[in-house]
Regions:
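Pro/Ala/Gly-rich low-complexity, hydrophilic intrinsically disordered segments
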Residues: 84-122, 131, 168, 204, ...
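Post-signal peptide N-terminal segment of mature Sec-exported envelope proteins
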Residues: 30-53, 58
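Bacterial signal peptide processing site
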Residues: 24-26
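Acidic, small-residue rich beta-repeat scaffolds with periodic aromatic anchors
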Residues: 144-147, 179, 203, 237, ...
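Bacterial N-terminal signal peptides that target proteins for export
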Residues: 1-12
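SH3/SH3-like beta-barrel superfamily modules
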Residues: 53-88, 137-227
Length: 364
């Protein structure tokens, strides 16, 4: 009897451990993740003509995949609040797309901001330049964006069939059953040096559209169609565009103004910014990001901006950057760095300094 009691205790303890382990394993079971790419959609209680709406899900929301219909048109999902329902596949993107956006954010965490901008219409944030590329987040009208880089892509011609998108990878159990599933490793498709697409042997020339790599107020990074974004160019320098397109602008330094323009002007003296501005041709699809630069300095005597430096015929590549550097006897001066392609197509770095109204190219 003395031996039976310890044995029973041991068996009971083992059973409890196994039960707890099984429960933990079941409760911690991971599901395939999917994300809402539509602005907003709803979950239905069944896949049928007549159904009830059981929940509303919003753009960017993460959902757990429970199962799919045979034709993969509908997906059975669960929200973070534990609500189950069916949703159309076209309103979702997979974990692979979400991870591409995460990679874009990591890769461009320290990229210098080229300009501030505002969306003038609702627009989608894409993983790569192009209307037919995957998108997840939708940006509202009036949203503030930091511009990081620029590229271009061909616009689909009217009547042309859109490029087919690879199907979302099914769960592991379904993949074993479906031998025809094509699952490939996703890589970030961010182009650093855009190449003009090859024209078809016959047919019209492709229409090229500029795209911008941007970061929104929530830190999300992706590509937007450039024509849906307005640059927040300071009014005092916007008037000097001369029909060219401003693609980047930076404050190099601030200088004091000499006070009122006339005796009747009671405004006190203030500091005025001096700018580096990058320009390009007013047409999408250029092989360069910018082809000229101008430095605007302030004339305190005449209370106006003047062009202190101008350089044309550049094959420029974004991003550009600004800074400050100690030049011994000259003191600490503003500097700016450009990246341009030489005649061989190699991207080289050029560094300049601003000393008063004088800009000098520094020797490498």
């Amino acid at each position: 009897m003395s031996r039976t009691l310890p044995q029973l205790c041991a068996v009971t303890t083992l059973a409890l451990v196994l039960c707890a382990t099984a429960c933990k394993s079941h409760g911690g079971r991971s599901h395939e993740a999917t994300y809402v790419s539509a602005p907003q959609t709803f979950l239905r209680d069944r896949v049928a003509t007549v159904y009830n709406k059981v929940a509303t899900v919003k753009n960017g929301e993460r959902l757990d995949v429970l199962e799919r219909t045979t034709n993969r048109r509908f997906v059975h999902v669960r929200t973070s609040n534990g609500v189950d329902g069916w949703v159309e596949q076209r309103s979702l993107v997979g974990e692979d797309v979400y991870q591409l956006f995460q990679k874009l954010a990591r890769d461009n965490a320290s990229s210098p901001v080229q300009a501030q901008s505002t969306t003038h219409a609702e627009t989608n944030l894409h993983v790569a330049p192009g209307r037919d590329t995957d998108h997840l987040y939708q940006l509202p009208q009036g949203g503030k964006l930091a511009v990081l880089k620029r590229s271009f892509a061909a616009k689909a011609l009217p009547g042309a069939a859109p490029k087919p998108k690879p199907p979302t990878a099914p769960p592991a159990k379904e993949a074993e059953k479906d031998k025809e599933a094509d699952v490939s490793e996703s890589t970030a498709p961010e182009p650093s040096t855009p190449a003009e697409p090859e024209a078809a042997k016959s047919g019209p020339k492709p229409i090229l559209e500029d795209w911008l790599l941007v970061r929104d107020a929530q830190g999300r990074v992706g590509w937007v169609l450039a024509r849906l974004v307005d640059f927040d160019i300071p009014l005092e320098i916007a008037q000097y565009s001369e029909g060219q397109r401003m693609v980047a602008f930076f404050v190099l330094t601030e200088v004091p103004d000499n006070g009122p323009k006339n005796k009747d002007d009671q405004q006190p003296a203030k500091n005025v910014p001096e700018y580096l501005v990058l320009f390009t041709e007013p047409k999408d699809g250029q092989p360069f990001d910018f082809n000229q630069i101008r430095v605007f300095t302030w004339n305190p005597r005449h209370h106006r901006y003047e062009t202190a430096y101008r350089e044309h015929k550049l094959n420029g590549v974004l991003p550009a950057s600004v800074g400050r550097e100690d030049f011994s006897k000259e003191g600490t001066l503003p500097t700016f760095t450009l990246h341009v392609r030489d005649k061989e197509g190699t991207v080289v770095e050029r560094k300049y300094k601003l000393n008063g109204p004088i800009v000098r190219l520094l020797k490498p």
